[in-house]
């Protein structure tokens, strides 16, 4: 399958045999569209750790289906419960920053151990994992419904002229299950025929913006321009950005936001230029225990080779990785940074838009008080 073939409408799904879980290997996009089967917990952990799947909601859904796979493979073992619990712990450790992973795994694990018969455990695992996936689809749909009003307001203020939105990394359907978080309001605006254009940060070192967000927007026909990571401030200074919408891998209910490294710099530039900076997320991405994002959210450090090397398409169609850093130079690869609540204009959630503060968030989610 190549990237010119009709694309799947989701990045993860259950195969027709109801045993295999299938994913898009997002490392291969945009040049090749590769589908991978997941049948073991080791494969699930590799898919998450190596970023075949990525994005907080999708990581949570993948972890949930990982528990289903763990149950399936443990059915014939005498130590069924111990084995499943061990595998659940392994899945939760695949990546540290996205809070959805532990949330999804724990939900399915609880459903499994509410049953006594192994066959019922398997059915419960599949039902709960599937429910989580569908909930995230609906959450993202509603994020779009609530967020599009912000874009409509700017469009009216500009007399129908183009609304320019800047986004960072990929918080589209590839990072979720459908719709996306940051892209959901954009897609909804496009459906409403609002004149909209998206500035897409390339998002070094793995270029999720250039590779994935640009590919997504192109598939939908949404006008977009890929820019270098450091160009956003310049565009803001010259009135070429109307708003910023990003996703998040973990946000505290007090308003601090962990997202792909570079997000903090965009928030600083937006504040300096009086540009609204919104974070789109489902409630599953809130950490309801943490109160200080900078001090408490774990920041993943990935392989330095991701910084030292870059992949690209050769004229003959081959995808090759080349080194761009001197051999004797060290590299550091912090995957995320934390944007403090004071720089965030608001959260766009499935329940509505609110300010980035404890009282505002809890007003939307009173059951978390």
Curated annotation (Swiss-Prot):
EC number(s) per entry: 5.3.1.23
Binding residue positions for substrate: 54-56, 95, 208, 259-260
Organism: Desulfosudis oleivorans (strain DSM 6200 / JCM 39069 / Hxd3)
MF annotations from Gene Ontology: S-methyl-5-thioribose-1-phosphate isomerase activity
Protein name: Methylthioribose-1-phosphate isomerase
Enzyme class, spelled out: isomerase
SUPFAM superfamilies: NagB/RpiA/CoA transferase-like
GO biological process, one term: L-methionine salvage from methylthioadenosine
Pathway in which the depicted protein is active: Amino-acid biosynthesis; L-methionine biosynthesis via salvage pathway; L-methionine from S-methyl-5-thio-alpha-D-ribose 1-phosphate: step 1/6
Gene name per UniProt: mtnA
Family: Belongs to the eIF-2B alpha/beta/delta subunits family. MtnA subfamily.
Record Pfam families: IF-2B
Catalysis performed (reactions): 5-(methylsulfanyl)-alpha-D-ribose 1-phosphate = 5-(methylsulfanyl)-D-ribulose 1-phosphate
InterPro entries attached to this UniProt entry: IF-2B-related, IF-M1Pi, IF_2B-like_C, Initiation_fac_2B_a/b/d, M1Pi_N, NagB/RpiA_transferase-like
Keyword set, alphabetical order: Amino-acid biosynthesis, Isomerase, Methionine biosynthesis
Residues at the site labelled Transition state stabilizer: 169
List of catalytic residues: 249
Its job: Catalyzes the interconversion of methylthioribose-1-phosphate (MTR-1-P) into methylthioribulose-1-phosphate (MTRu-1-P).
